[in-house]
């Protein structure tokens, strides 16, 4: 039956008949319920829930007995420290070996019951019991920030939209790995430096990613550009983001910036040259050793002036969005030497 009375009236009706309903016998309850459903329009099951006695107190949560108390936790801490703070999954198979040794040397004095608990405790339970002591051992940090992280935080971020037509001398720097199909072991890498204003690009081979060799390659590249370098923009590679390299760049008067992590478009200029120059010229093979490094350097000596003096390239002038379509307009293609009025100073010294 459709509801014919208001909510306030239904509430008053419940208050009027609820005590009589609860104190009646089964037959009378059925008759009262029929009348109540007919008047209010409630579903019969809902009417029963409204009229039946409410529980005086909610059911209490189930209480579980504590199996691994503080004495188990203290013994686990001793085992954890003795194992050089291993994770629980590695510590569990080591407990049968460590436990007799610690008891033999007086570090632990355990009852048979406590000893059995330590031998049967699961790795997940060990994680829960050791969670607080692990936070204290870390000094309250989730993980320790290394020196490279501190150096990275000290270097300001520069995105692809922050350049605003700089003067010649601000370069993006990146590594191209000549590792072939395997990145294991030591292999030659090419340091690529691309000037933002002119597109002038220099490539310097590096035998390993050691910071001293990185500094030597940067210093060598400075002598190859036809204008003085003003700033370097690195990615977040640890070969660049370390105290030695960053401090050297700043001591040379170079402005040091970095791109955002996992945002390759922040270094779009040098990323384009990685493929257009290095990969196109050298390919994807594996190069190893001093002899390969020297040969690669001689190759770059031959092609550097050809690309920078005679190879015209496009440079974006403006970009306009029209609905879902992006329209790009470019300056007329010219070689890097013709951009920015850069004076030609042929540097050597590779």
UniProtKB/Swiss-Prot annotation:
Q: Where is the Integrase catalytic domain?
A: 164-327
Q: What is this protein called?
A: Uncharacterized protein y4rM
What molecular function does GO assign, one term? nucleic acid binding
Single GO BP term: DNA integration
Q: Which Pfam families match?
A: rve
Task: Alphabetically list the UniProt keywords.
Answer: Plasmid
PROSITE patterns assigned to the protein according to its UniProt record, in alphabetical order: INTEGRASE
């Amino acid at each position: 039956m459709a509801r014919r009375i208001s909510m306030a009236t239904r509430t008053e009706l419940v208050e009027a008949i609820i005590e009589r309903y609860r104190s009646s016998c089964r037959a009378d309850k059925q008759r009262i319920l029929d009348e109540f459903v007919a008047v209010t329009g409630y579903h019969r099951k809902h009417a029963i829930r409204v009229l039946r006695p409410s529980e005086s107190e909610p059911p209490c949560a189930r209480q579980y007995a504590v199996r691994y108390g503080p004495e188990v936790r203290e013994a686990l801490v001793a085992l954890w420290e003795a194992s050089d703070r291993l994770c629980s999954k590695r510590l569990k198979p080591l407990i049968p070996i460590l436990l007799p040794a610690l008891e033999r040397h007086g570090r632990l004095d355990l009852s048979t019951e406590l000893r059995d608990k330590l031998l049967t405790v699961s790795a997940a339970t060990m994680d829960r019991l050791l969670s607080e002591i692990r936070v204290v051992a870390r000094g309250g940090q989730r993980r320790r920030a290394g020196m490279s992280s501190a150096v990275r935080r000290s270097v300001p971020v520069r995105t692809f939209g922050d350049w605003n037509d700089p003067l010649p001398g601000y370069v993006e720097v990146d590594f191209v790995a000549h590792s072939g199909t395997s990145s294991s072991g030591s292999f030659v890498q090419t340091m690529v430096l691309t000037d933002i204003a002119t597109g002038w690009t220099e490539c310097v081979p590096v035998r390993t990613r050691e910071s001293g060799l990185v500094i030597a390659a940067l210093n060598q590249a400075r002598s190859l550009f036809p204008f003085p370098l003003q700033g370097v923009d690195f990615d977040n590679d640890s070969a660049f983001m370390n105290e030695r390299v960053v401090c050297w760049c700043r001591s040379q008067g170079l402005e040091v910036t970095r791109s955002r992590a996992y945002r390759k478009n922040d270094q779009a200029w040098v990323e384009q040259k990685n493929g257009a120059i290095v990969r196109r010229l050298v390919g994807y093979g594996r190069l190893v050793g001093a002899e390969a490094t020297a040969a690669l350097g001689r190759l770059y000596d031959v092609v550097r002036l050809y690309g920078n003096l005679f190879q015209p390239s496009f440079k974006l002038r403006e970009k306009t969005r029209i609905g879902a379509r992006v329209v790009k307009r470019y300056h007329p293609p010219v070689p890097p030497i013709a951009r920015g009025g850069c004076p030609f100073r042929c540097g050597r010294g590779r």
